[in-house]
Amino acid sequence: MSIIQTAERSSGEDASENVIFQRHLIAYKKAAELVKKNILEIGCGEGYGIKELLPKVEKYICIDKYESSINFKSEKLTFIKSEVPPLNKIKSDSLDFVVTFQVIEHIEDDKFFVEEIFRVLKPGGKLILTTPNKSMTLSRNPWHVREY
C-alpha cells in the first residue's frame, strides 16, 4: 500500500478548530477516569492528551506515524514513530489499556488494527476507542479511509 496522507491534526490554539479540539479533549478527560498502570496511545499527534493521562499511569507509550512534537519529558513516557498496524514494537500481553481517539477511520486494514491492539493488551486489558459517527456528520471527511 502506498502511503497516503490521511492524518488530521487539531489544536486548541486555532479558534476555527476549537470545537474539534474540545471533542478530542473530552475523550481524554473521560479516559483519565479509567486508565491506570501501563498504557499505549495510538495516534498521539501533538500530545495534548498526555497531560490528562500521564499522571494516572505508571508507563505511557505513544505511537504516531509522524515525528513527535511532544513537549513533555517524563521517565514514564516513551514515543515511538511508526505506522500502524502492525504494533511490532510492542510486546504481546504487555499493556493494561490502549487508547486511540479518532484514528481507526484513517487505518486501511481496520480488522488487523484491532487484532493487534488485542494482541498487546494483557488478559482483561481495556481498549478505549473513539471514532466519528458517520450518521451525525454533514458530509464524508476526505481524510477518512472509511467511516463508521
Model-derived regions, located:
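Acidic carboxylate diad motif detector
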Residues: 129-131, 135
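A short His-aromatic
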Residues: 102-106
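A short glycine-rich, Lys/Arg-flanked "PGG" loop and its adjoining helix->strand segment in the class I
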Residues: 111-126
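Short catalytic/ligand-binding loop motif for oxyanion handling, primarily in non-cytosolic enzymes
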Residues: 49-50, 135-139
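Acceptor-substrate binding/catalytic loop of class I
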Residues: 138-148
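Conserved N-terminal segment of class I S-adenosyl-L-methionine
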Residues: 1-93, 97-101, 111-114
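Short, solvent-exposed loop/helix junctions and linker helices
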Residues: 21, 107, 147-148
